[in-house]
Amino acid sequence: MGKKRTKGKTVPIDDSSESLEPVCRHIRKGLEQGNLKKALVNVEWNICQDCKTDNKVKDKSEEETEENPSVWLCLKCGHQGCGRNSQEQHALKHYMKPRSEPHCLVLSLDNWSVWCYLCDDEVHYCNSNRLGQVVDYVRKQAGNTTPESAEDNGNIELENKKLEKESKNEQEREKKENMARENPSMNSTSQITVKGLSNLGNTCFFNAVMQNLSQTPVLRELLKEVKMSGTIVKIEPPDLALTEPLEINLEPPGPLTLAMSQFLNEMQETKKGIVTPRELFSQVCKKAVRFKGYQQQDSQELLRYLLDGMRAEEHQRVSKGILKAFDNSTEKVDEELKNKVKEYEKKKSVPSFVDRIFGGELTSTIMCDECRTVSLVHESFLDLSLPVLDDQSGKKSINDKNLKKTMEDEDKDSEEEKDNDSYLKERNDIPSGTSKHLQKKAKKQAKKQAKNQRRQQKIQGKVLHLNDVYAIDHPEDNECEVEMSLQREADIKSNHISQEEVAPKEYCVNQKDLNGHEKMIESITDNQKSTEEAAMKNVSVDNDLEVLASSATECPRNLNGAYLKEGSNGEVDISSGFENLNLNAALQPDEINIEILDDDPTPGTKVYEVVNEDPETAFCTLANREAFNTDECSVQHCLYQFTRNEKLRDANKLLCEVCTRRQYSGPKANMKGERKHIYTNAKKQMLISLAPPVLTLHFKRFQQAGFNLRKVNKHIKFPEILDLAPFCTLKCKNVAEEHTRVLYSLYGVVEHSGTMRSGHYTAYAKTRTASTHLSNLVLHGDIPQDFEMESTKGQWFHISDTHVQAVPTTKVLSSQAYLLFYERIL
């Protein structure tokens, strides 16, 4: 007995020492060597038993014979059935039959790989001596059996027919290849085949995204143009006196772009059934180190890093081309050369291939209720992150209301004690897991620090009053605190919290970051400079910015240190002293592009501009948006919530410069020059003003609940044909006149199954003929005028790493979508 125990203990150690791959737990129950040897006596190899009994082998069409579905051998009973890629899927049906013991282990008779249906993963039989011996035995039996040993003449005739059909199919393939060589245009518009992708180690998040990008033919077309050597681009001069545009010669694309092009070509042209995207993934890891280490990652973040990385390489190509063009001329002064290069970089009108395919534009419209002045701000996007509300959101909103009430009561008490105090009004998201006791304790500590701060200000004798960051207010008393009104614009990029889950809060002279720590905003005098940096980690807040001014003024999100200059009349001028202070160091520069406004705002700066817009039509859309069922959990409802009309009231009022100028202009102006800012009620809405050729939608299923992250598993309905017109502005740029529909066709889905800690990403991709409308829109800018039905037809496939299976459309629409890929058809 002792020997048996020691032997039983050493077996798992030996198995685990062979490889780091986990051993399948179902080998013992799913493997029956005795039954298998009996079943393999005088057996016909590579023929599905069920198809043979149904007389479907002899009636196969030429197309089905050409596909030649793989046959899987059950290691429990020796049953041979066609794989899941076939039409009948007899091997899978054999496993699904109810039995006392599972028939879960199957062996592929094509490549001799073992698959476990229960684990839904490949089993490496080198890890198990018993499984390896069985596979070797089966291979020997299959090798010893020859067609001559078959006594049935019908089988020989069947094999002869197969050989004849295969020869005919080879001749047809050669004809098709010759036709494709003669007509390269036909080859470009043909359907892209679906191939599996090798898992490099928890890289299913990467494989699922790449499967959908590989089914984007226009991306492959543009990458061919990018790779062309000697590409010359013309850039209009920034100075009107110069009439000739600058011609620049672009360098070869960057390593990430080249790896992407190589991957797409391999997916299209290789004859292998499985592609290993090792080079592309390594280039992504070089751009974003966070994806190293073979950990579970987020598919949407991977997509953003990939697109941003390729776009940055394209911008770098143009910048280097401009610099080389000036180096070849007679320019010698370095300072002048730098200034000219910067001017041309601002003027450059060469959008990258990423923006041409995935780029769209959002327009935020805000209107003052008093003067009805309309102002706009434009912001580009590569994807839209849509909020997903679940049943727990109602409970959280109730807790937020109670928390808000207690915070407002404390603020009222502090106002009675300090008449001249000003408050930092900031919309912030308080984790629901934080207790009220901790909130009150932190509040008291902040008040004590504020008292000490005011004492220091009395000693110094000079007090600075910051009113909404950019304007100066004369302090009536020496006991004034910093007043800042920070407002955040909705982040249409990745990972942000829903607007429903954010309630306005007021804090007394403190700023609270997402980790729950409070940092005081120190008073700044002419003898000291201070910078306060609030780091936002892991989660970015998507609170809506209250607009500080409707006429080309906005509170900066990036203020890197405040420098003060004392005026001649004793006032402190800070309007020209703010530089970029990064309040969100975790985000990339491309993701948030709000800077302080000066006299010469740079391109890309997010500026609210006053426009002569009719207030009656400023918030109109291309199509009626009131026909949606608000109770329905669908992608249309998520878009409706994302673009819903908001009212700025109470603490979220608009600081209107037009109303302020009207109030304090003329004889009403104060002799001392003092002017109080006028806050008014306003209306705000964000709509799509440029519909992208390829629309990418992201459902924010991963949300923060207290100090933890959770996943929302609610099913969201999404259609095959999506009309984006109810969410577009009335003057949408790339929509034909008098068109009231902006139609998109679904061609890709990324699904996340499982939980936050142990989940799996798979892809649904549709093979179809390439859309001529989409190619003309991206390549030539031609707006589609009519509906193209052919682009909506195709075959859906479900891809889980290396395994590809044809599925019906109903299964795609019932999946738990995380990313949706739509292409423009009208």
From Swiss-Prot:
Post-translational changes noted in the entry: Phosphorylated at the onset of mitosis and dephosphorylated during the metaphase/anaphase transition. Phosphorylation by AURKB enhances the deubiquitinase activity.
Signal peptide range: none
Gene (name only): USP16
Disordered: region residues: 144-189, 393-458
Basic residues bias spans: 437-457
Protein name (database record): Ubiquitin carboxyl-terminal hydrolase 16
Phosphoserine: residues bearing it: 188, 414, 530, 551
UniProt free text on domains: The UBP-type zinc finger binds 3 zinc ions that form a pair of cross-braced ring fingers encapsulated within a third zinc finger in the primary structure. It recognizes the C-terminal tail of free ubiquitin.
Originating organism: Bos taurus (Bovine)
